[in-house]
């Protein structure tokens, strides 16, 4: 299997996001890398499912709450920027203050 650097990055995000999902399901609080991976994964999958950039940016602040992440993590993530493939091409999605 020959993967481009971008494809390797996406696989790493997916792997970390699946771990984050399992930890959330067990009631554990996410650390910084897990929270970023989870948010990034939801953007990538939302784009794949046909959601628009505007929809993802609006929903992005509802995916994680402060009580789902370790202390200090919300302050470490003032925004998340992720490139996602939409039906009309690759676009940059920015989530502002994604953990509220």
UniProtKB/Swiss-Prot annotation:
Record carries keyword Ion transport: no
Protein origin, superkingdom: Bacteria
Bridged cysteine pairs (disulfide): none
Gene Ontology CC entries for this record: cytoplasm
Pathway the protein acts in: Nitrogen metabolism; urea degradation; CO(2) and NH(3) from urea (urease route): step 1/1
Subcellular location: Cytoplasm
Reaction(s) the record says it catalyses: urea + 2 H2O + H(+) = hydrogencarbonate + 2 NH4(+)
EC number: 3.5.1.5
GO biological process: urea catabolic process
GO MF, one example: nickel cation binding
Family from the record: Belongs to the urease gamma subunit family.
Name of the protein in its database record: Urease subunit gamma
Native source organism of the sequence: Prochlorococcus marinus (strain MIT 9313)
Lineage: Bacteria, Bacillati, Cyanobacteriota, Cyanophyceae, Synechococcales
Gene from which this protein is expressed: ureA
